[in-house]
């Protein structure tokens, strides 16, 4: 039997619309929405901004102003892999014959120096819709689950 492939976006689709998920898995894909270049470009700019601070082992001022006491994840080559949609995070779940793959934007490390905190840049071209917090919360939980399956401590 083939391994069932999941991703944070596929799980989000299931949570939003189980029928849409079933249709997607059975050959009727949802049409792709327009992907505006501004949010995609901002995502890249934010990653580069955080990477500059990471290379100096410093926190970006946005995190300092928010009172964050930890640090940025320091392993840039590993983070680059985890950001890549073809390599990304991989959580094998042989007990249910499934694998979950996803690409993360960034990681923070709690002040204990061990606990990883998934971090995602939200750069939407429009105002957030009602209930967006739940969607993003679930997305971060899925990234946390994947990191735990990979052997990391997650907060």
Regions inferred by a protein language model and the residue ranges of each:
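Metal-dependent nuclease catalytic cores that hydrolyze phosphodiester bonds in DNA/RNA
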Residues: 1-115
């Amino acid at each position: 039997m083939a391994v069932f492939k999941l991703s944070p976006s596929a799980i989000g689709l299931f949570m939003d619309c189980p029928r849409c998920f079933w249709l997607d898995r059975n050959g009727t894909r949802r049409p792709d929405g327009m992907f505006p270049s501004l949010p995609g470009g901002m995502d890249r700019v934010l990653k580069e901004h955080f990477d500059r601070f990471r290379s100096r082992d410093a926190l970006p001022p946005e995190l300092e102003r928010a009172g964050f006491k930890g640090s940025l994840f320091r392993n840039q080559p590993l983070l680059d892999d985890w950001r890549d949609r073809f390599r990304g995070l991989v959580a094998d779940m042989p007990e249910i014959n499934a694998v979950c793959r996803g690409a993360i934007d960034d990681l923070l490390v709690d002040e204990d120096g061990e606990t990883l905190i998934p971090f995602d840049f939200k750069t939407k071209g429009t105002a957030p819709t009602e209930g967006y917090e739940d969607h993003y919360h679930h997305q971060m939980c899925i990234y946390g689950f994947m990191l735990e399956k990979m052997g990391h401590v997650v907060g």
